[in-house]
Amino acid sequence: FADKRDSQCLEQIVELTEENLKENGIELQELLADGGYSSGEALAYLHEKNINAYIPNFGQYKSEREGFTFNKEENYYQCTKPEGNQAKLLFKGEKTDSKGYTKRTYRSSETDCKNCPLREQCCGKSTKFKKLDDSIHKEHYDRMHQKLTQNATYAKKMVRVRSKTVEPVIGTLVNFTNMKRVNTRGIKNANKHVLMASLTYNLKKYLRFITKK
């Protein structure tokens, strides 16, 4: 997984985890991950699999557009600024940027914004129209945002669980056991190295909680 972003690895990680859990008669019901695993594709996969996930949306996500409301039925943005010209930003198509993200573009006409007193503030000094871009996976980001905000208490609890159980592992292995590098050649040997380190970590953790005789 080292040559990919975390979000690109989520599907394979989930499948491997499910296989391991099934061998022990355990069903995957909830999934916790940090924002690095957030992507439209990852959230779409989890939704399709009906997995109840708690993953903070990535940094560029915006749940609301200040001064604009979205008309889902007719697929356009409406300017709602009291001092503005109430322009409509119509859907203009989809475009993939240099980073590989496909977005939907919404744009007003120059005529609608031409004499608006907020044009320069809203559009910029040289631009004559307003443009907004949304991810093609916006519905999945919105669904996750709604879950995290409507169930804020439980979502925060899940963050604490993740912080206590998942995030300290790599820090412990690197800082306390000095596993700053894998001293093996090849992916298979590196995988064995990490598996043994994980096994040792889990065994030490287990021994802390068993009843002492």
Predicted features by range, described:
Residues 1-213:
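Anion-binding and metal-coordination hotspots
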